[in-house]
Regions:
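Hot-dog-fold acyl-thioester-processing enzymes
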Residues: 2-81, 143-156
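HotDog/MaoC-like acyl-thioester-processing domains
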Residues: 1-14, 94-156
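Generic structural detector for well-ordered beta-strands
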Residues: 19-23, 89, 105, 135-137
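Mid-chain, well-packed structural core segment of small domains
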Residues: 74-102
Length: 156
């Protein structure tokens, strides 16, 4: 377990940002398909994917969206944040083996603890794969919480 301290609304500043990295693995794609029910063969079947414009299997777009959600919930503003909305543009496919940098930046502080965030994702080549914006309700007070350790989950 690890301790994480959120950043409450009053401490957020325009321009403040965080970058979280994650390598996309085979198991991520399989688990996301199993949990979401999105069994599109472009994600799961190499032979099928070879006949698409991508020429190979790709990760689910919303898997990348989930990484954005995790960065907001766990890093900026962090625990206690409530999602109000999200817009995503998928610029390029995410491939298995890609290392993604999820960048969350404070764009604007709005009334009633609402915050507008830039949500961008880049691959290991510096190519932007996702561009978006989120609106969240930031926590009112600073809290340090213990983040639970997650069990190892497998797909059989």
């Amino acid at each position: 377990m690890s301790l994480v301290t959120n950043i409450p609304y009053e401490q957020l500043t325009v321009g403040q940002f965080v970058v979280v990295e994650r390598r996309v693995e085979e198991r991520d794609v399989l688990l996301f398909a199993a949990v979401s029910g999105d069994n599109n063969p472009v994600h799961l079947d190499a032979e099928f994917a070879a006949g698409t414009l991508f020429k190979e299997r790709i990760a689910h777009g919303m898997f990348t969206g989930a990484l954005i959600s995790a960065a907001i919930a766990c890093n900026l503003p962090g625990p206690g944040t409530i999602y109000l909305g999200q817009h995503l543009d998928f610029a390029k496919p995410v491939k298995l083996g890609d290392t993604l940098s999820v960048r969350i930046q404070v764009l604007e502080k709005l009334p009633k603890n609402r915050v507008r965030l830039a949500t961008e994702v880049f691959n290991q080549h510096g190519d932007q794969v996702v561009d978006g914006e989120a609106e969240v309700l930031a926590p009112r007070k600073e809290q340090t919480v213990e983040m639970p350790s997650m069990p190892t989950v497998t797909v059989s």
